[in-house]
Amino acid sequence: MDTKLGLVEEEAAN
């Protein structure tokens, strides 16, 4: 399960 959470985490780390 790494579709929305992965994008959210990447945007948050940006």
Swiss-Prot record:
Enzyme class at the top of the EC tree: hydrolase
Keyword Hydrolase: yes
Enzymatic reactions: diphosphate + H2O = 2 phosphate + H(+)
Molecular function (Gene Ontology), one example: inorganic diphosphate phosphatase activity
Subunit details: Monomer.
Protein name: Inorganic pyrophosphatase
Upper taxonomic lineage: Eukaryota, Discoba, Euglenozoa, Euglenida, Spirocuta
Protein source organism: Euglena gracilis
Domain of life: Eukaryota
Family recorded in the similarity comment: Belongs to the PPase family.
Catalytic activity, EC: 3.6.1.1
Keywords: Hydrolase
Membrane spanning residue stretches: none
